[in-house]
Amino acid sequence: MTKKIAAFTFAALTALGFASCNERKFHVEGAIENAADSVLYFENMGLNGVQTVDSVKLSADGAFAFDGKAVTAPEFYRLRIAGQIINVAIDSTETVTVKAKYPAMATDYEVSGSDDCSRIKELALMQMQLQQSVNNIARNPLLGADAVADSVQKVVEAYKTDVKTRYIFKQPMK
């Protein structure tokens, strides 16, 4: 009887071991320069808000690696140190590699392994440029309130048109 229990236990543990080895995962890895001793957070951007998935205190080389169970539908994550954020899209079991430089990692980074992540970076940079344009218009002392409103509307409409034609209409089902 104890031999049967031992054999069953061994078989169950072996099956569990194989299942865990075969678990499909995605990977986010890379390095962030100039961020030694900073805490890098890997966060899920879900419908219930931001949830921390994992974190790591970066060493002198800034290397990091996170992974998670493969997703059935694309999900958004972000890498964050303080107020600096890099948005990442995960689809299936891909490996996304990020190389960045702190403290300007939100704008000074490279991403590979995902076309979606590259597009997200382009859109984030475009949005930052839009915000800068709006701020410059609002601070212009030569413009009255109506001229500011008109100018802001024009740059926002130009931004929307650009996003529609270069991203949405280009791949409407993506």
Please report, for each region that a protein language model flagged, where it lies by residue.
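Bacterial N-terminal signal peptides that target proteins for export
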Residues: 1-8
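Repetitive helical segments and hydrophobic/amphipathic motifs
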Residues: 12-13
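C-terminal motif of bacterial Sec signal peptides marking the signal peptidase cleavage site
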Residues: 16-20
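A non-transmembrane, solvent-exposed segment enriched in polar/low-complexity residues
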Residues: 21-167
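Amphipathic alpha-helical repeat scaffolds of TPR domains
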Residues: 172-174
